[in-house]
């Protein structure tokens, strides 16, 4: 009966990050700078890995895939946020909202599975160095990458399949700056208790479990190379530290958002900005600043693209 008497809303209205015009302009410039830097940083990694034959290894192949995902993840929300910061009325159509949610959870799932594959790569590299090339062959890496994208697709389609049949008759105001399941679900004109539990389980609890499994896996990895000599152990620790930092930046905000009842809290928008905008920016910095191999490859690429004038 609810669906029969329900006229589905045609759009949602965002309250956005702020209602203050001056603050909106400052945020616009800041987020534009962050977005452009994110694109350039991840594109630089992709071009370097593609052009430098020394980086044609499983670890950098997986990093290349993560950079693609980070560009996509940032592009799902940030361009719309930039437009809204300059707009008086911040709206999004019903179909666009659900498309944004689908893509958001698709790429978010890809990020989670890709970080897991990268942990597997480090484990094999450190624990089974003699068999590394066989276990992490190019075909296997491609298969794992495809599996990460399929996993993200399945995760996302489950979210949308649960939300789409619900009656959205109004209200249609979202106190956020992008469409996400925990916000949109609260607008459904029906009892959402069971669905909220399913969403928390599918997003929050699984994300929390996955995070601790990854942390444990890296602790195990770091305990493996004790028998290795200094340089090999230092390189392993440096690489794993970068991975742990990225995993923490990605998972902790997600756990805060999804592993609790879907009630609005004062810190929600700031935390959402952290993992939708800031995390894709920091990933390339983290993976390059402590990676001498990547920095050397970038310098070689620069010399090839910008030849020195010196004779």
Swiss-Prot record:
Cellular localisation: Cell membrane
Keyword line: Cell membrane, G-protein coupled receptor, Glycoprotein, Membrane, Olfaction, Receptor, Sensory transduction, Transducer, Transmembrane, Transmembrane helix
Ranges of the Extracellular topological domain: 1-25, 80-100, 159-195, 259-269
Any one GO CC term of the record: plasma membrane
Gene Ontology MF, one: G protein-coupled receptor activity
InterPro entries named in the record: GPCR_Rhodpsn (IPR000276), GPCR_Rhodpsn_7TM (IPR017452), Olfact_rcpt (IPR000725), Olfactory_Receptors (IPR050427)
Bilayer disposition of the protein: Multi-pass membrane protein
Reported function: Odorant receptor.
UniProt similarity note: Belongs to the G-protein coupled receptor 1 family.
Protein name per UniProt: Olfactory receptor 4D10
Organism: Homo sapiens (Human)
Record gene name: OR4D10
């Amino acid at each position: 009966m609810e669906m029969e008497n329900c006229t589905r809303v045609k759009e949602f209205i965002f309250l956005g990050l702020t209602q203050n015009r001056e603050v909106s302009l400052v945020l616009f410039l800041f987020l534009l700078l962050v977005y452009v830097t994110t694109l350039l940083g991840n594109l630089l990694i992709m071009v370097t890995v593609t052009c430098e034959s020394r980086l044609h290894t499983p670890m950098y192949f997986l990093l290349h895939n993560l950079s693609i995902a980070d560009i996509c993840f940032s592009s799902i929300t940030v361009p719309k946020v930039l437009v809204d910061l300059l707009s008086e009325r911040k709206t999004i159509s019903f179909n666009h909202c659900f498309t944004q949610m689908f893509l958001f959870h698709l790429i978010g799932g890809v990020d989670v599975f890709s970080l897991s594959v990268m942990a597997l790569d480090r484990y094999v590299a450190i624990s089974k160095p003699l068999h590394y090339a066989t276990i992490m062959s190019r075909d296997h890496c491609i298969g794992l990458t495809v599996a990460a994208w399929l996993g993200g697709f399945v995760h996302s389609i489950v979210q949308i399949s649960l939300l789409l049949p619900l009656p959205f008759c109004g209200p249609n105001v979202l106190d956020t700056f992008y469409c996400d399941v925990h916000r949109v679900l609260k607008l459904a004109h029906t009892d959402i208790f069971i669905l909220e539990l399913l969403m928390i389980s599918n997003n929050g609890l699984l994300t929390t479990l996955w995070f601790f499994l990854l942390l444990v896996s890296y602790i195990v990895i770091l305990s493996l190379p004790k028998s290795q000599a200094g340089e090999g152990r230092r390189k392993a620790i440096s690489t794993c530290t970068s991975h742990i930092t990225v995993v923490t930046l990605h998972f902790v905000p997600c756990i805060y958002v999804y592993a609790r009842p879907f009630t609005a809290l004062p810190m929600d928008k700031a935390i959402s900005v952290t993992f939708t905008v800031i995390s894709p920016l920091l990933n390339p910095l983290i993976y390059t600043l402590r990676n001498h191999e990547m920095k050397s490859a970038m310098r070689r690429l620069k010399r090839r693209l910008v030849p020195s004038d010196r004779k």
